């Protein structure tokens, strides 16, 4: 079978500098898509709607579910939410899109560029979680079926690194709504066919003008 892995579209920023403390929602950050992200999600319809998709799966996070929604409507499929597809920092109180990380958190950006997850992440546990999620989806689609999975850069990268025997989990730059394909054989073989197809969305990948940086010392958790 074929797994079509899609990174979510561009979400909004959630940062301490964006609103007074009294106006900030409590709990983990779970941002919706930006208008640009909504357009990116619509582009997935043209990229994938003609394929024989038998199942559509998504992370529980809003940015992934919103990305999957237009494709689900075009395919006439109800997305299946898989909790183990959530990103490694799903419980963080802040979310900063990756193109703003060099300004807002240079140390985290350099760690990501080095291919490393944050020090706070149990890499082994995260790898096992996402691998189990993907293998469960594979098991549900035997033969020559195709399933689409909308998730996150860390989730997709970590599984690819495991499949390819790489020693660092964040190896591939994955753009918003970039498409990666993995072929899964009944004999257990997994073949990475393509990584980060972006022809459908190339003109929407130039980062928007960054918002003003917060005051020095007001740190935020940044995410892919």
State each model region's role:
Residues 52-60, 146-150:
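Short glycine-rich phosphate-binding loop at a beta-alpha junction
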Residues 31-32, 74-132, 193-194, 205:
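Phosphate-handling substructures
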Residues 167-189:
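Domain-level recognition of soluble alpha/beta enzyme cores
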Residues 1-54, 69, 73-77, 94-95, ...:
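An N-terminal RHG(E/S)-centered segment typical of histidine phosphatases
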Residues 70, 158-162:
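Active-site signature of alpha/beta-hydrolase-fold catalytic machinery across serine-
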Residues 49-52, 137-145:
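Glycine-rich phosphate-binding loop signature in dinucleotide/nucleotide-binding domains
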Residues 153-157, 185, 191:
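GST superfamily/GST-like fold recognition
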